[in-house]
Curated annotation (Swiss-Prot):
Species for this entry: Vibrio campbellii (strain ATCC BAA-1116)
Keyword Cytoplasm on entry: yes
Gene name in the database record: rlmE
Keywords of the record: Cytoplasm, Methyltransferase, rRNA processing, S-adenosyl-L-methionine, Transferase
Residues that hold S-adenosyl-L-methionine according to the record: 63, 65, 83, 99, 124
Chief localisation class: cytoplasm
Cellular component, GO, one term: cytoplasm
EC number in record: 2.1.1.166
Active-site feature positions: 164 (proton acceptor)
InterPro entries (UniProt xref): RNA_methyltr_RlmE, RNA_MeTrfase_FtsJ_dom, rRNA-MeTfrase_E, SAM-dependent_MTases_sf
Name of the protein described by the UniProt record: Ribosomal RNA large subunit methyltransferase E
Reactions accelerated catalytically: uridine(2552) in 23S rRNA + S-adenosyl-L-methionine = 2'-O-methyluridine(2552) in 23S rRNA + S-adenosyl-L-homocysteine + H(+)
PANTHER family: RIBOSOMAL RNA METHYLTRANSFERASE, RRNA METHYLTRANSFERASE 2, MITOCHONDRIAL
Function text: Specifically methylates the uridine in position 2552 of 23S rRNA at the 2'-O position of the ribose in the fully assembled 50S ribosomal subunit.
Length: 209
């Protein structure tokens, strides 16, 4: 019995230690967060980002996704980022601080974007966790629905969408909605995403407009 307990706790410790390597690596390389590795892995598999693109980054702070995307799209591209929290400046990124759920913030964001001219909408938004799934999951699904609605307003034909989603109530219906709007939809769980987390990333390409 004690051996079994030891084995389970050792397994948890090893998993935490493995997870920490991403945070440590991010600090060592000057990346804004471990999220940098998530979008890097998605890009390696799905090739969403290309030089010269226009990208919207929702839930951007502290800037891991914007930092990576800016490197790929280069000086010819542009990123419009938004978050409730402040974010240190990144070259090539236009940042708007505010609550994306607020109509005034959404309007201010849309003013910076030409309709149907965005190539990729990225969303790493997550709600403040209350610790009660019956509260947390609807909040999380509300945010991903807002991100999908942003696609309807700004995404160019054949554009792409990548969004963090927590598996649970409303997940299957959301994926169905995305499939109705995009030609190809994949579910990704990057190695740098904690195994115990319910987060996955819906990666959609070929916006039908």
């Amino acid at each position: 019995m004690s051996k079994q307990k030891h084995s389970a706790s050792s397994g948890r410790w090893l998993k935490e230690h493995f997870d920490d390597k991403y945070a440590n690596e991010a600090r060592k390389k000057g990346y804004r967060s471990r999220a940098y590795f998530k979008i890097e892995e998605i890009q390696t598999k799905d090739k969403l980002l290309k030089s010269g693109m226009t990208v919207v980054d929702l839930g951007a702070a502290p800037g891991g996704w914007s930092q990576y995307a800016a490197k790929i799209i280069g000086e010819e591209g542009q990123i419009i980022a938004c978050d409730l929290l402040p974010m240190d400046p990144i070259a090539g990124v236009s940042f708007l601080q505010g609550d994306f759920r607020d109509e005034a913030v959404l309007d201010a964001l849309l003013e910076r974007i030409q309709p149907s001219m965005v190539d990729v909408v990225m969303s790493d938004m997550a709600p403040n966790i209350a610790g009660n799934n019956s509260v947390d999951q609807p909040r999380a699904m509300y945010l991903v629905e807002l991100a999908l609605d942003m696609c309807r307003q700004v995404l160019a034909p054949n554009g792409s969408f990548v969004v963090k989603v927590f598996q649970g109530e409303g997940f299957d219906q959301f994926v169905k909605e995305v499939r109705d709007m995009f030609k190809v939809v994949k579910i990704r769980k990057p190695d740098s995403s904690r195994a115990r987390s319910r987060e996955v990333f819906v990666v959609a390409t070929g916006y039908k407009g």
